[in-house]
UniProtKB/Swiss-Prot annotation:
Residues 685-828 form the PTS EIIA type-2 domain. The active site is at H15 (pros-phosphohistidine intermediate), H298 (tele-phosphohistidine intermediate), C611 (proton donor), H747 (tele-phosphohistidine intermediate). Multifunctional protein that includes general (non sugar-specific) and sugar-specific components of the phosphoenolpyruvate-dependent sugar phosphotransferase system (sugar PTS). This major carbohydrate active transport system catalyzes the phosphorylation of incoming sugar substrates concomitantly with their translocation across the cell membrane. The enzyme II FryABC PTS system is involved in fructose transport. Belongs to the PEP-utilizing enzyme family. It comes from Escherichia coli O6:H1 (strain CFT073 / ATCC 700928 / UPEC). Residues 119-650 are annotated as: PTS EI. GO terms for molecular function: kinase activity; metal ion binding; phosphoenolpyruvate-protein phosphotransferase activity; protein-N(PI)-phosphohistidine-sugar phosphotransferase activity. This is Multiphosphoryl transfer protein. The lineage of its organism: Bacteria, Pseudomonadati, Pseudomonadota, Gammaproteobacteria, Enterobacterales.
């Protein structure tokens, strides 16, 4: 017997998704494989995902796999690599509690005296609809169905039908839906799930209905006893597939409580299973209130992915009496507004207007090319492993794909993908990209990414071993097939080719020879293909740094693989806990190496990118910009924030920062430099067209202040519009800011304003400003930084003096548009 010992690396513990993947990895071997959680003293068949889930394994638990059988040597080698390298990728990090904290109730809402119920935010957003109560299903009618001689046949038929339905949904879905459906499919195909139902029928003489329910209750009891919130919340998945199985078996007995949404609806339920959520018409699902759903339930993951706001912590009996009434679910402030009056409805209409503006602006910003504040261009690309990830990456603002990991096509299967399968996968991502560049990294397999069907012997140091370009000559046919597939796909878009683990010029010369052979073959075969293709290499072996000049004669670009390069430069295995603290790319030696690569390549007209984890680290963006990199490729969710940060950076200041960092003596000195580095603020004028509005319709004073503060948030002049609004209201409560002549000047000095601003709204109809000076039809709001000194008094005084002038006031009221108001103020005022 052979053993693999490890600490569980999964942040959420061993739940359905990673359990299914581990089961799949173990099921390909003849050997018996037992999973042991030493903390729990729990053992499980590693070829059963349900058994694995039942071990209650949490993050950092001490675990082992015991392997015994004819292929135990090979199984241990492959499984050890999987546990060390890829097991953690089967889990996903959920939003933290801090990310889901509700905003304090804005004064512009609380002053309207809404009828509110307070809950906990599970998925952010705002939804308006009719409160609709969904009663939980009772399973009692299934439990009392008598046993029948046909029960075994019925069970097999129902399991097959449910599997067929799930497979059909898998073909129609993508993203989180597909992932969760895959987990459900794996559960019903698990031997333990069906086996225990059969056992309950045979040994305890239960009818099929009772056996399905008993099996569900037994599994749920194990999960409910877990110390992990995440594992406890998998109860909903077990209940979901069990209830689906019951309904398929006896559809005539009682239909599941599926709801048809014919109008905008706020759904109220004790809980909702993933399949129930997927059956809803999301166009009419305005929001959900779920009494028992936790922060990591699969239903909640689906809701977040679909931008459906969700609250919890509201007892059903407190809401039931409001069923059928209109409501607003505000999962930004964590409240449910019951039967809102006109003023409250008006508040949320303004909130929706601001949200629409923000969404439109974010979409436009993501679509813009990435530039620094002084217009230094840098490409921002995405790292992906499948064509399905491409649309999401482009939606996040990716200007291309800097790393397409083609090895994903070769993993977790019994044989290599053929040319046609690869061609279709590569073509799919190129068609999705349009004219955006896609860099296909040729298969980085072998070594640390063991592929059973290649039969490469086990190595002591797989990261330094027989992998990537090093195996291509032995598997020349496999490599040529991939080249042919990429060249064929390249005729449909902007494809580029990148070779991993290159360390010598001979390797790239051999690759270029194989590339020419593939082109000749495709011509001979009469297949559509690209005649030429841009060729680059991954710079991850330090030896390449010293002969960049020679490589510039043979390739078109370089992409630095910072993950492996860091390991090789320091001789550090980042998966070894004893030396992993030494793994740090932000050191003088690493930065000098990057500087050397970029300088040598640029001198010869070649571009340099980086595609490791470092490329998406916002803290180090000033250094990467300063070093002169042409491209940063990263996980696509990081792209919007990186683009936004880049626009605030001056490339010359960053270049000086990088120069100083390369002169440092230690990583600690570099970190201190970064901490002290303060990018110059993008100076914005006090008056700007984006903050001036004419012919605005507000019902009250609250809406005016809400809109003007919210608009500053949309325009990036504040990152805290709610807090800024509170400062405005605090000043307003000292003395109302109506100044007469139909004008109000709300104002504040605030730490929450990033760029001091004057905002103006000229109203269609005057509103009550709750001032002795009468109604207001022109609002001029001053929001000045807390460090402005007495400048706010100067600005306020100038405005007040001008407003006394009748001609000036008349000009403001008569101005045809926002530009005319801006021109008038710029002419008349001096700041």
């Amino acid at each position: 017997m052979l053993t693999i010992q490890f600490l569980c690396p999964l942040p959420n513990g061993l739940h359905a998704r990673p359990a299914w993947e581990l089961k799949e990895q173990c099921s390909q071997w003849q050997s018996e494989i037992t999973f042991i959680n030493h903390r729990q003293n729990a053992k499980a068949d590693a070829k059963s995902s349900l058994a694995l889930i039942g071990t209650g394994t949490l993050f950092n638990d001490s675990c082992s796999l015991n392997i015994s059988g004819s292929d135990e040597e090979q199984a241990r080698r492959v499984l050890e690599e999987y546990i060390q390298v890829r097991f953690i990728d089967s889990d996903s990090v959920q939003p933290t509690l801090a990310e889901l904290t509700a905003h304090p109730l804005p004064r512009s809402l609380s002053r309207l005296n809404p009828d509110l119920l307070y809950g906990n935010v599970l998925a952010s957003g705002v939804g308006v609809g009719t409160l609709t109560l969904l009663q939980s299903d009772s399973l009692d009618s299934y439990r009392v169905i008598p046993a029948s001689a046909q029960d075994s046949t019925l069970l097999e038929h129902s399991l097959a039908t449910l599997a067929e339905q799930l497979n059909q949904q898998l073909r129609e879905r993508d993203g989180e839906s597909k992932t969760i459906l895959s987990a459900h499919l794996s559960l019903i195909q698990d031997d333990e799930f069906a086996g225990n139902i059969r056992h309950l029928m045979a040994e305890q003489h239960q009818g099929l209905g009772a056996a399905i329910i008993s099996n569900m209750e037994q599994i749920c009891a194990k999960l409910s006893a877990s110390a992990s919130d995440y594992l406890r919340e998998r109860v909903s998945d077990i209940r979901d597939i069990s209830e689906q199985l019951l309904h398929i078996t006896w559809p005539e007995l009682k239909p599941r409580n599926n709801l048809v949404l014919e109008k905008p609806t706020i759904l109220v339920a004790e809980d909702l299973t993933p399949s129930q959520f997927l059956s809803l018409d999301l166009k009419n699902l305005a929001g959900m209130i779920l009494e028992k759903t936790g922060r990591t339930s699969h239903t909640l993951i689906l809701a977040r992915a679909s931008a459906i706001p969700v609250l919890s912590g509201l007892p059903l009996d407190a809401i039931a009496r409001y069923a059928g009434q209109p409501a607003v679910l505000d999962a930004q402030c964590g409240v449910l507004a019951i039967n809102p009056n006109d003023a409250v409805s008006g508040y949320y209409q303004v909130a929706q207007t601001l949200a629409d503006k923000r969404q439109k602006q974010q979409a436009q910003a993501a679509a813009q090319l990435a530039y620094s504040r002084d217009k230094k261009r840098i490409d921002i690309a995405a790292n992906i492993g499948t064509a399905l990830e491409a649309p999401g990456a482009f939606a996040n603002g990716a200007e291309g794909v800097g790393l397409f990991r083609t090895e994903m096509l070769y993993m977790d299967r019994d044989s290599a993908p053929d040319e046609q399968e690869q061609f279709e996968a590569y073509q799919q991502v190129l068609l999705a990209a349009g004219d955006k560049p896609i860099i296909f990294r040729t298969m980085d397999i072998g070594g640390d990414k063991s592929i059973p069907y290649l039969n490469i012997p086990q190595e002591e140091n797989p990261f330094l071993g027989y992998r990537a370009v090093r195996i291509y000559p032995e598997f020349a046919g496999l490599f040529r097939t991939q080249l042919r597939a990429i060249l064929r796909a390249a005729s449909f878009g902007n494809a580029q080719l990148m070779i991993p683990m290159v360390h010598s010029l001979d390797q790239i010369l051999w690759v270029k020879g194989e590339l020419q052979k593939a082109i000749v073959e495709l011509k001979r075969d009469g297949l559509r293909h690209a005649e030429t293709i841009t060729l680059g290499i991954m710079v991850e072996v330090p030896s390449v740094c010293y002969i960049i000049d020679h490589f510039c004669d043979e390739v078109d670009f370089f992409s630095i693989g910072s993950n492996d390069m860091t390991q090789y430069l320091y001789a550090v295995d980042r998966n070894n806990p004893r030396v992993s603290p030494l793994y740090n790319p932000i050191t003088p030696s690493f930065l000098r190496m990057l500087q050397q690569i970029v300088t040598a390549a640029h001198q010869r007209g070649k571009w340099v990118g980086i595609c490791g984890e470092l490329g998406g680290e916002s803290r180090y963006l000033p250094l990467l910009l300063g070093l002169g990199l042409d491209e940063l490729s990263m996980s696509s969710p990081r792209i919007p924030a990186v683009k936004s940060q880049l626009r605030q950076l001056d490339s010359e200041a960053c270049r000086e920062l990088a120069r100083q960092a390369c002169e440092c003596r230690s990583a600690q000195e570099i970190e201190a430099l970064l901490t002290a580095f303060t990018p110059e603020e993008d100076v914005r004028p006090l008056l700007a067209l984006e903050n001036i509005f004419v012919d605005q319709s507000f019902s009250n004073k609250e809406q005016a202040i809400q809109f003007l503060c919210g608009n500053l948030g949309v325009n990036g002049r504040t990152e805290h519009p709610f807090e800024l609004e509170e400062d405005v209201w605090q000043r307003e409560e000292i003395v109302t800011t109506g100044v007469g002549f139909g004008v109000a000047i709300p104002h504040t000095k605030s730490q929450w304003i990033r760029h001091s601003s004057i905002s103006i709204a000229r109203l269609v109809k005057p509103v009550d400003w709750q001032s002795e000076m009468g109604e207001v039809e022109l609002v001029i709001m001053l929001t000045l930084g807390a460090n402005e000194g007495m400048n706010h008094v100067k600005v306020f005084s100038q405005l007040a003096r001008k407003l006394v002038n009748k001609n000036f006031r008349q000009s403001l009221f008569a101005a045809q548009d926002a530009q005319s108001i801006l021109t008038l103020l710029e002419t008349e005022l001096t700041f």
